[in-house]
Amino acid sequence: MTKKRLTRDLKWGFQYFPYYQMRIECEKFHGWAALNELTDGEYMYWDFFEKAGRVPVAGKGMCWLTLIPDGRKHSITAMFMEDGNVSAWYIDVIHSVLIDEDGVLAFMDKYLDVMLTTSGDVLVEDKEELDAAYRSGEFTEEQYEAALLEGQRIIDEWGKDIHATELICKEMLNYVKAQVNNQPLTVFLDIDGVLNIYQPDSEVQTLLPCAGENICELIHRMKAKVVVISSHRLGGRYWDMLLDFFKGNHIYDIDITPYGEEYHSRTEEINAYLHMHPNIERYVILDDCFQDDYSCDLKLREHLVFVDALKGLQKQDIIKACEILNRQAPVCRAVIHDV
C-alpha cells in the first residue's frame, strides 16, 4: 500500500499551495475534510472519459476538496473548477487514515479507485494492482473482497445520482471555505536583510529585485496576510516606498506588530500581535535575526525562516515558508480509523 498525504506532495506537488484540513460534524457529513487551493500553475487535463471527454483536473484557480467519511473505507476528492463546478471526482478505496508528524492527514491507499464525471462517466481504475496485491499475499482474501465491495459501494453511493453528489460536495466546500476565511495564513516580515542588503550609509535602502519577486510569490501563492515587524513600520520615506511596492504588486492585506516602550524584543511584539489575533494559528517569520534570534521563545522559533542578510530572501526560504504555513495544529499522531 502507498501512503498518500492530502497535501498531495507525492505526485501533484500541491504542498506549496494553501492547504487546510478540519473535522466536519453535520447532518449530511461526519468525517475529515481537506482543501487544496491551487493559486498558480498551468492546467492539466484528463482526456480518457467517454462522455465528458477532456476535463481539467488541476490549474490556477481550481481547488480540490477531499472528504473522508467516518466508518467508511474510501476518500472522495472533488476537483472544482474556478466557476465553482466539479470537473471530476477521484475516489480511493483506503485501508486507514493517519496523521503525519507535521499534522497533515494521510491515508493508506488500497489500490482500487473509482473516477466519476458530471457527464455520467464511471471508471474503475487500478484493479490489476489490487489483484497483484492479493496474489502476492499483501492482502488476505477478506481484505481483497472488502476492497471490491467498497468499490461497488462507491459507485452506488456517489455515482448513481451525480447531481446529488455535486450538490453535497458544493455544500461541504462552502462550509470549509467559511472556516478557512477565519484562519488567515500570516507572514511576519522583517525588511532589512530580507528584502534588501542593509547599507547603513544609505538614507534609503534599495529592494533586491529577486527578494521582492520572492516575497510577492509567497504572498500570492499562499494567499497570506503580511505583518511587518521591521522598525521601518514606524513610518518615513522608506516605509512609504514599501507600501507603494506592495500596492503595485496587488498586496493589500498589510498590518504591523505593536510597538512601544513596553516591548523589549520582536519576540514580545509578535506574541502581543498573536494575542490580539487569536484566530492566527498558522504563520511564518521571515527574519535575518539581527535584532532578535527568538531563542527565548522556542514556540516562535519553530515558525522562523532565517534569511541570510548577505543574500536576501531566496527561493529555498520561500519553500521552507510554505512548508511551515502548511503545518497543521498538533493532534494525536496515530491511526484515526483502521478499516
Feature roles, as predicted:
Residues 1-62:
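Charge-rich, low-complexity N-terminal segments
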Residues 240-339:
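C-terminal cap/substrate-recognition subdomain and adjoining C-terminal extension
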Residues 150-180:
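Cysteine/selenocysteine-centered motifs that mediate thiol-based redox chemistry or coordinate metal-sulfur cofactors
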Residues 182-264:
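Alpha-helical substrate-recognition element adjacent to the catalytic core
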Residues 57-99, 107-112:
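Phosphate/ribose-recognition catalytic cores of enzymes acting on nucleotide-derived substrates
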Residues 96, 194-195, 233-235, 289-292, ...:
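Short, solvent-exposed loop/turn segments at secondary-structure junctions
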Residues 90-137, 295-296:
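Conserved, surface-exposed functional patches that form binding/active-site neighborhoods
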Residues 91-94, 189, 229-232, 286-288:
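Short His-Asn-centered micro-motif
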